[in-house]
Amino acid sequence: MKHIYWFILLLPVVIGACQANKPTSTSTVEGPLTEAQQRLPENAVRGLKTREGLETTLFASEPAIMNPTNMDIDEKGRVWITEAYNYRNELNPGHPYKQAGDRIMILEDLDGDGKSDTAKVFYQDTCINAALGICVLGNKVIVSCSPNVFIFTDTDGDDKADKKELLFRGIGGIQHDHAIHAFTFGPDGKLYFNFGNAGDSILDRNGNVIKDAEGRLIANKGMPYRQGMIFRCNLDGSDLEVMAHNFRNNYEVAVDAFGNMWQSDNDDDGNRAVRINYILEHGNYGYTDEVTGAGWSSRRMNMEDSIPYRHWHLNDPGVVPNLLQTGAGSPTGMVVYEGDLLPPVFRNQMIHGEPGHNVVRAYPVKKQGGGYTAAIENILESSTDQWFRPSDVGVAPDGSLFVADWYDPGVGGHQVADLDRGRIFRVAPAGSKYKVSPPVLNTAADAVTALKNPNLSTRYLAWTKLHNMGASAEKELVNLYHSNNPRYRARALWLLSKLPNGADYIKTALRDKDEDIRITAIRAATEAGVTYGNMLVTDPSPAVRRQALLAMYHSHEADMPANWALLAAQYDGKDRWYLEALGIGADSNWAACFDAWRKLPPNKQHPEADNDIIWRARTPAALPLLAALIQREENDPMQNKRYFRAFDFYPAKESTPVLLGLLKGHHPKQDYINALAFMQLDAGALPRTGEMAKLLHNALQVFKDRTEFIDLVRKYKLRDQNETLLQTILNKPANEIQGYAMKTLLECGGQPLVVKRLQGKDTAAAFILVEAMGKAQDRPNRELLTALIRNKVYPAPLRELAARNLGRGWDGYADLWSLVERKLLPADLDTVTKDVLTHAWRQDVKAKAVAYYEPAVVNKALPPVEKLLAIKGDIPNGKKVFASYCSSCHLAGNTGVNFGPALSEIGSKLTKSAIYEAIIHPDAGISFGFEGYFFQLKDGSQVLGYIASQTDEEIDVRMAGGQGVKLRKTNIASRKAYEHSLMPTGLATAMSQQELVDLVEYLASLKK
């Protein structure tokens, strides 16, 4: 879920026989429910709100099943479930472990009342512990469980796995929610699946490295693929393709009849950037920097103004836009509903589980240019029960919707809470019986009927039957192709395209009046290797032209550049989907495409379109044109950052001469242009001349008091700017800028200036400088703080502040404790130092300090969470407690520091009990992306924090308090995972019981 962000811990439940207790879905309790009553299966539906016109019934629940992670529904209407009892046990060592392993369950309704009558164990073993995906294809079941993908086969029809085979292996993310997800059967007869950014790499069943058709390694190595990926392959795993990449945790890909791919992707916790994606084949979706692999928070030219958009590098050329951004959340399973039992608003649309918001919803789309827009329509949501956590959705053969509910108090990290619960719901029109008859597949006509079914498993059987029949099924498929339903027509076309005369059907479909059929035909032609020349370059539909561009990806056809140019000439300057399709189509052939395009007349109707194509291009021929755009006097150079950013996507040997040339311009705002050029240039490439020094000095004035000023001073080692740096610090800019400026000042030899101010009469200035040193936290600043603490010449308040600021970082805590341990701490600082060290987030230092200063409270115990929940908290006081204990690392609204996960909507995501658990036991639920790492540097210093970004040359580490430090990899002696959460253990005991209750009350009130 958002990782999945389920918290499980399940008591062993043994179902020895196939019979299961039929769930009772009718509550017998009148009036409001107690907490205990609300958890009972018979009250499950009472806590939910269903879309008008639909009815939700409880199909199955505990004890028959527990913690469903993924679900599929077979052609008989049976529900298959992967469970996760053995979930993240290494992170939760106190929880029981089922030695027999986790289970695959089959649930069946025998009498059509919409409630499961039997629960069978299909397979149980530790090799599928906490599996994240299941796909039922006839007598074969594909199960996704990193590091493997298994195919289980029931050879004798007894609903037991008789054979286990590997499909893929070597996938990262063992016991991780960002790992391999569910497979699905596509309308083209291929398998589609994805993994999140813990998947990392994939090997074939024999352990061999897999490369794409171009010979490129399929792995998160930036050659070219990064982070999470979508894949397509044959049923036997051969011909693996990367369909798109650079996602964070793309959870489950859904494929419609036309071959369109849809999925969700979640953000780094708390950044309100969850997204829904429409997939352009071979697209880059921007989670990390395409070239360097740097994270989204790393500063770059033309950085997006808001974090939700910055999160996906949406201002960068080469990043496909998002269909929809839905704020915070924990997205899980998705399906395209191609049935007609549900109301029209849900038909042919994505349906999706969002446990972070306790909702199942659809995203109805409308075509717009080369892409889509989307809205949100809820189907099923929590009304009173915040434990409702939909982990997957599926469509039954009768068209009803099934929802798997993980059922847990929280979604966040790898912590687990509930021991034995899990539910399956059925959503259908009120009074709708659940009657399913297995498909009859004796004839082609039978199979065509089954091919129309909304259930994927049924369609797989139909597709396989028709495909195996070959030409003998042609007549029935042609009849289906001429039906009035575009999705039936598309399914028929896919099969017709695979016949010996399939090229004829494809070429006919390319001229069809329905643009979706034309798009399907393009995809079928690409798979079949059918060429069609310039047939589509003047197609009236921008969506068809978009697909024609995507089909040009790595094409070797002689007329491809000319056709690409004609399609480029029709770009309107507004449609980002179309622009990115142009970029994908020209990939590996930019020089020829760009040359062909430049030979065409300029786009007088949409002149901005030509500028965008230059910006998106990846050929040296575009660089002089980029420079010309920057130098146009009618352009506001303040808006030229997007053009300067484009230089980052070229090798320095190509971009440097053009950037140096920009320094010689005569624009009315030339200093600003020069400033941006200096930002983009490599310092070693700059001629060291007096003229260049003057240009650089003038450029600095453009960025005075801004981060870019410090960047330039540090980049070019400008010691003559130390006074200005000092003044920047004293102007009290934002936290990160102030620490960065202080670090840069000392790097540039500015320590004498700092000491002079500390010894001066301006007390306010001295206090500001000490705060800045604490934010910097590098060795020179810590040494300066230590010297200040020990020197009684300085006034006591300043030295107290120095002690507090030394105790803000990993090494700083050690330095301060060392003064205590070695009896070097002046006695008048004992009280403040005790306060700092006994509240330290560095565990080893805190333990020593508490034992030294407060031995009586070492074993202070809190009452059980159940008792804390019964105490009423005070929200206003909880806000004050947050400011005292939490705001140095967390944001809540506009208050606090952006270090740990933002808590602005935490009350929508976690129940009170889950919030208590997260505070009391932080090690049990570390959010993905916030895992700590301990770095030992070659100079002897140490750094602890989480990795915000990483490139081939350096690692950007965020330390407690929100300060960042960039570590050159060549300066790192060792790196190892930190075994604890960066959130300090014992925080709950550092405050009073009532303060803890008030804090939780406040956090629980923070909702969307």
Show the residue positions of the predicted features.
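Positively charged n-region of N-terminal signal peptides that target proteins for export
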Residues: 1-5
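C-terminal motif of bacterial Sec signal peptides marking the signal peptidase cleavage site
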Residues: 16-17
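Beta-propeller domains with acidic blade repeats across secreted/periplasmic ectodomains
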Residues: 22-446, 465-468, 894, 968-970, ...
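C-terminal capping alpha-helices of c-type cytochrome domains
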Residues: 59, 139-140, 148, 191, ...
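Sec-exported extracytoplasmic/periplasmic mature domains
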Residues: 154, 569, 587, 807, ...
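Sequence context surrounding c-type heme c attachment/ligation sites in exported
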Residues: 397, 404, 873-887, 894-917, ...
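Long, ordered, helix-rich scaffold segments
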Residues: 404, 420, 427-881, 899, ...
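C-type cytochrome heme c attachment motif
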Residues: 423, 495, 880-894, 901-921, ...
